[in-house]
């Protein structure tokens, strides 16, 4: 079997998330149909991260296996894109060892969250950033709060109550807010994420600085292991799966 890794970008606005669902348009489902048309095979697609409805991707990664390389590897992305709509694109394809699995082989996943912090919203931000005008966001204070998220913690307080993972422990390597003009970019990198985890982290950091919470308030929320202690879930449309990191990379 030939193991093919693909890097994917998509505008998540008109998708019901990554994972295949009956009678719904999903990213995994659309790629599956394109692979079937190119290779004539029923295959399994393994994705690095499961994005929710409305969430975008700049560098999502997936892999699938096919018995024959009917298309040269440098043309695979072109062949697949011919069966995909314009809001979903395969950026590149690579042949990988059989041991590679986009989900299991990833050591870290990195998300980007964009907040437009202005008194006026702009049409081109509507689908791609959280418009926040309640106050001028203090990114320096946010970065002080964020220090308490680094490392391994029980993130029960920072995930949906519908999350089905047995363990809520996750490791975060980086949580950083960077301001460029009226736009704030949150970069959050971890080994894995719980349902709505990034969006709840961003919403809690933003609302925390608005309320002028003490520096260690994040620590108290983590210790509570109670979703009700954290703040709002930031909107899906500001979130992007930015990239994945793999072993030996």
Swiss-Prot record:
Disulfide bonds: none annotated. It catalyses: uridine(38/39/40) in tRNA = pseudouridine(38/39/40) in tRNA. Its EC number is 5.4.99.12. The active site is at residue 52. Belongs to the tRNA pseudouridine synthase TruA family. Formation of pseudouridine at positions 38, 39 and 40 in the anticodon stem and loop of transfer RNAs. Homodimer. This is tRNA pseudouridine synthase A. It comes from Brachyspira hyodysenteriae (strain ATCC 49526 / WA1).
